């Protein structure tokens, strides 16, 4: 799901984030490990504010954390 299709500025659903990563042949676990984190660390950003993890995920999607989680910023 690309932000230009979203007009209501709601946070992305966690399944949409995971799906977008999958489309890019990535997973949260792989992304975490490639950033020297535990394979489960990035999952925390799906449910609560975690700026470091949010940035890693957003960068992987070519976006900003504010695009994905507008309610947190």
From Swiss-Prot:
UniProt-listed Pfam families: HTH_35
DNA-binding region(s) in UniProt: 28-47
Primary localization class, coarse: host cell
GO cellular component assignments: host cell cytoplasm
Gene3D superfamilies assigned: lambda repressor-like DNA-binding domains (1.10.260.40)
InterPro entries cross-referenced by the UniProt entry: Lambda_DNA-bd_dom_sf (IPR010982), Ner_HTH_dom (IPR038722)
A GO molecular function held by the record: DNA binding
Domain of life assignment: Viruses
Induction (free text): Expressed in the early phase of the viral replicative cycle. Early gene transcription is repressed by viral Repc (latency) and favored by viral Ner protein (lytic development).
Keyword set includes Transcription: yes
Function description: Switches off the PcM promoter thereby blocking expression of the major repressor Repc (latency factor) and favoring transcription from the early promoter (Pe) and hence viral transposition and lytic development. Negatively regulates the early promoter (Pe) thereby controlling its own expression and keeping the level of early genes expression independent of the viral genome copy number.
Name by which UniProt lists this protein: Negative regulator of transcription
Lineage: Viruses, Duplodnaviria, Heunggongvirae, Uroviricota, Caudoviricetes
Gene of this entry: ner
